[in-house]
């Protein structure tokens, strides 16, 4: 139910843009940046003083408040809270966000600044209880559509956000069962719209639909098919050796 609700919220987002003739952003949408004003260029928030963070706004434009530096950081989007240098060697330390993250934040803030008048109502929806951080990020990889419709696409819930692609494409099959592709146009026997890709469909993607036996759990099956090579691809290579 939560997954379907989150998909519906993002469909509403697309509807709002279409109704107002606003193109869908080509960059990943990070809704948590809508209304945020914390400094992100130069030193990352982790290295800023409390004084630098005071009076600014963090997640979804909420005021940065608290009794400690940790409290202040907790008010920021989760990807802005940590030490960006913890995976770097001493000589590579920059104390700042990588360029790609700075670019995404800049793009999202400008997008919201330009269109906040049409997104105010929707902002309440995306902040509903039960929305995971990654579900508040969204990537539309389907190009221009006059009336964009998530329910005719392939959806994948990833750690980096909800990714939507044309139905002619299937995301990589991985072990993590939360990232199994969703086929939203199929109606289940219970009358619900949308379901996850089945083990048999995953086998067919790898041209293994003639298999008599498939691993008996979703996790095992997708791990096996994700680590496999497409049978037809191997056959064509072998035919040309």
Model-derived features with residue positions:
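Flexible, glycine-/basic-rich loop-and-beta segments that form/coincide
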Residues: 1-58, 63
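C-terminal target-recognition/interaction regions appended to catalytic cores
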Residues: 36-241
């Amino acid at each position: 139910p939560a997954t379907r609700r989150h998909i519906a919220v993002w469909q509403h987002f697309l509807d709002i843009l279409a109704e107002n003739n606003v193109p869908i952003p080509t960059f990943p949408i990070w809704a948590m940046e809508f209304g945020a004003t914390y400094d992100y260029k130069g030193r990352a928030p982790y290295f800023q003083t409390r004084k630098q963070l005071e009076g600014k706004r963090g997640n979804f434009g909420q005021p940065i408040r608290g009794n400690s530096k940790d409290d202040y950081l907790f008010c920021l989007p989760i990807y802005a809270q940590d030490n960006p240098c913890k995976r770097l060697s001493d000589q590579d330390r920059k104390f700042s966000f990588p360029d790609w993250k700075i670019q995404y934040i800049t793009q999202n803030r400008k997008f919201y600044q330009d269109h906040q008048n049409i997104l105010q109502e929707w902002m309440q929806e995306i902040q509903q209880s039960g929305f995971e951080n990654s579900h508040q990020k969204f990537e539309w990889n389907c190009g221009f559509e006059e009336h964009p419709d998530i329910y005719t696409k392939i959806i994948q819930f990833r750690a980096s956000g909800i990714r939507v692609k044309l139905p002619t494409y299937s995301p990589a099959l991985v072990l993590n069962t939360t990232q199994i592709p969703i086929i939203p146009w199929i109606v289940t026997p219970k009358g619900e719209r949308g379901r996850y890709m089945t083990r048999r469909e995953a086998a067919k993607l790898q041209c293994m639909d003639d298999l008599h036996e498939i691993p008996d759990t979703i996790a095992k099956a997708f791990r096996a098919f994700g680590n496999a090579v497409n049978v037809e691809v191997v056959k064509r290579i072998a035919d040309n050796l």
